[in-house]
């Protein structure tokens, strides 16, 4: 399988769009490639639709400044079973600074679908509490003012994540655990910290060195 970058570019008076997103080509398994490309385009298309809708609803604002929408992709891991990466979005429609957000894509090449974080763990296991404890310890060591609520043991706090041989990375967008100026906060959770909770035969097991 070959992973490249797709691009959507548009520059007109009053607005500029530059979207980069991953595209998978896999002649041997075209169905998997189509599923991956649909998964990667979904958040891009949603961002474009919202941006264009705002341009229609608030046309009077744009002559004062240029509206901007961007996305970038970073591959964190590409293996025979998994593609894991982060899409970073940013839109500027006025205000003090751009509005950033993150979308992760963890795609199981065996099954041809994106996976949720809960799926790499044993059903019913206390993975949110385990991740919360590790992340809070790491975040508090950075002297952040109040990371507790944004990294509590709520599964909704861990929706942006990637996997690689060195561990599970949790990403917290601006405002979730720190002020905007602190930027995105990343916490690497070594596989050794959650190995006992991983689903046997699951997508993370080979990365963690666990045998089926």
Language-model segments: which ranges?
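Compositionally biased intrinsically disordered regions enriched in Thr/Gly
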Residues: 1-212
